[in-house]
Amino acid sequence: MKVYQRNENIKINCPNMKTLVIALIGLLCYTTGISQNRNAVLIETESFDKKGGWFIDQQSMDVMGSPYLLAHGMGKLVADASTKVTFPEKGTYKMYVRTRNWNAQWSNKPAGKFQVGINGVLYPKTFGVKDQNWNWVSGGKVKIDDLNVEISLHDLTGFDGRCDAIYFTKEKNDIPPNNNEGLDMLRNELLGLNKKPKENDFDFVVIGGGMAGTCAAISAARLGVKVALIQNRPVLGGNNSSEVRVHLGARINLEPYPALGNLVNEIGPGRGGNAQPKDYYEDDKKLKAVLAEPNLTLFLNHHANQIETKDNRIVKVIAQNLETGERQAFNAPLFADCTGDGTIGYLAGAEFMSGRESRSMFNEPTAPEEADNLTMGISVQWFSEKVETPVDFPDIEWGLPWSDEKSFAITKGDWDWETGMGKDMIKETEFIRDYGLIVVYSNWSYLKNNYTNKEKFKNEKLKWVAYIGGKRESRRLVGDYILTENEIRNQEMLPDGTAPSSWTIDLHYPDEENLEKFEGEAFRSIAKHIKIYPYPIPFRCLYSKNINNLMMAGRDISVSHVALGTVRLMRTGGMMGEVVGMAASVSKNNNAEPREVYQNYFAELEKLMQKGVGDASLPFIQNYNEGGTLMEIQKVK
């Protein structure tokens, strides 16, 4: 049996886990090579009792090693985060804080500054001002007069200061390790997190709680399958949640299986619009639908980052609680990767594709002549609201150079506030999101303080800026069939068609003018559309070619980059999930793996697709952002 870690730098016996509050007296040896008697306390910030106005950000934990707290105040100071700690003894300690100066690559003036408080007293050292990369920064010496201590994080700017952990030590030269391997070993040793995780047994485990994963879990549960749904955010919906605020798109209830999509209609929001107020996205509606299913167990705030495999099958997925660091193992005969990033498939060694394939690879007319790493980007959306009296916004000195010519005199950043195209969507997620933030702040600060027509914006208040990026593309797991532009545009129907994809082939590219003005780092995009007739996605695109018990739904299915342009829409992903949940039922009833469902039991799956699992009696509310197809052009002719 092989154990695959989510980070290549982590050894098998060092799964990346988070710590709560630890006191250690005694001998400890870790990867820095230091072996000494230490008297130390380590505090992981995401485990703070009170988060105040700080948010847990897990988007880059597979790269930098940890969730962390983020002071995302959009220019307004956020309330302190705090926790209570028991020290092993009184005395003088050295303090180290793991943090980074997030805008250092763009300015020598830091944006996200904060202080550490001890029993209500703020220590003078300011953090978030030094290293561009995550590192331990010395906070000097602190005196602990009481064993019971309150530790707090105090925001100084409201502009996304961030803190991973705080370390107190009495020993000389006891600087904690900064590499992921050393940090993992330190945390595991201090908390005993290398102990065997709690075991859970299910028929079907779905990882990823976006529309695709949520529909997959509900679909299977309604068909009698015992399901676990693992989601690494506090809400369901993914890009359609109030954290990202992208509205649903594409069509449902299409031939050859018009009942597919009733589930999307049942749990999806009734209003459209990107970057709208929170209630538009109806997070509670999705949550209530999941909680109503007796066969479905939901694990919010759990990040799957380790698996076990045997004989090209996943045996278990291990996920950690983002706040407590507790690990749980999920055993099942069948899994679904609905993470978007293809995380579970990647950990299992599944074949995958990324970037753009060359034209010769699939003979796609829209593909580039040469393969490259260009992908569609991440959107950091935002909007303002008009208020009755003038409202200030800081005239930031750390933003990008701006001018009237560079500015966008608007009050909302929609899908086309998109960046990161050409970057690594996994390894550079934090950079991409941060660049999305700095351009929003730079533009808004300029409009409020220096724009020629700034009077137009004096009563505009920056209401919301996403700190969770809306991602479109990263890994695509390879199935027994790779769907391409050719089948879709030529209407080459395959015998295992399932959920129809109806949106245009919608591919995004950097806006050339924006690219030039901002020296090759565009944050605005354009979309090029090719209308299609709806096309049923082959079932063979919904399971892995080489991991025998892994299915997938959403943007990580087996398609070319060009074909992804149509299948990636969330209503389509929801229908994929509905099909994958049905396939899990067929698999359970026949003790069959996904490939065998295609080969031997597809007729059973067809019957389920004809019936659907959603409530067909509900009013149809998914009539916004449906997109145009060639069907309308045919009607006009």
Regions flagged by a language model, labelled:
Residues 198-210:
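Beta1/beta-strand and adjacent pyrophosphate-binding region of the FAD-binding site
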Residues 191-198, 239, 301, 313-316, ...:
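Flavin (FAD/FMN)-binding glycine-rich loop and adjacent Rossmann-like elements that form
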Residues 1-36:
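Bacterial Sec-dependent N-terminal signal peptides
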Residues 213:
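N-terminal Rossmann-fold NAD(P) dinucleotide-binding loop
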Residues 36-197:
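Extracytoplasmic
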Residues 225-226, 231-308, 353, 376-384:
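Conserved N-terminal/central alpha/beta ligand/cofactor-binding core
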Residues 220:
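Aromatic pocket-lining residues of Rossmann-like dinucleotide-binding sites
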